[in-house]
Amino acid sequence: MEWKIESLPVPYDKAMCFMQQRVEGIANKTQDELVWLLEHFPLYTAGTSARSEELLTDSLFPVYSTGRGGKYTYHGPGQRIAYVMMDLKARDKCNVRLYVETLGEWIVKTLKHFSIRSYFNPNLIGVWVNHNGSEKKIAAFGIRIRKWITYHGVSINVFTDLSHYSGIIPCGIKEYGITSLKTLGVNILYEEFDVVLKKEFNKVFCNC
């Protein structure tokens, strides 16, 4: 498994092209699987089940339609994105549901390292915390699979400007809010967070 970590924001369309090419390379056995850590410039993305009324304004940031599952979400500075390109066929114990659950376990264990208690919700896909008596999402999931190769992945709010979510109904869920590590009192940089992400990834996927 190769790891690629970007130091500067990656344009969204460039990232999509890169992932599609990498998926083909993995399927053809000419390239290795990849975990790609990055952030994007501010933007909204619409998944395959997004509804037009969930986009409250299109004047804040660019809006991209994407082939991943899910609804509207935000990407931008302060949000660590992990795009995971993995061959599920090469893992006898892995199927799509187990893959998504294992992604959830990965993020939960990463957050636990920073003393954040969280949980993966299979019904409201993502990782959630109970903050001041209310449930808030801290990590969103958007997955696509082609030729049994996964791509897209997980976005975790590290020090994200949460006001940027105001132009959408995040993931189509009105009842609950969004939070970040910074909002929860954990002030860290990507460098520290990435070390833990990689360590916990290797643990949870080692038997998969």
From Swiss-Prot:
Positions marked as site (Lowers pKa of active site Cys): 137
Annotated compartments: Cytoplasm
Record-annotated active site: 171
Pathway the protein acts in: Protein modification; protein lipoylation via endogenous pathway; protein N(6)-(lipoyl)lysine from octanoyl-[acyl-carrier-protein]: step 1/2
Enzyme Commission number(s): 2.3.1.181
Signal peptide as annotated in the record: none
Keywords (A to Z) from UniProt: Acyltransferase, Cytoplasm, Transferase
Annotated HAMAP family: LipB
Other observations noted: In the reaction, the free carboxyl group of octanoic acid is attached via an amide linkage to the epsilon-amino group of a specific lysine residue of lipoyl domains of lipoate-dependent enzymes.
Family, similarity comment: Belongs to the LipB family.
Name this protein carries in UniProt: Octanoyltransferase
Gene name, Swiss-Prot/TrEMBL: lipB
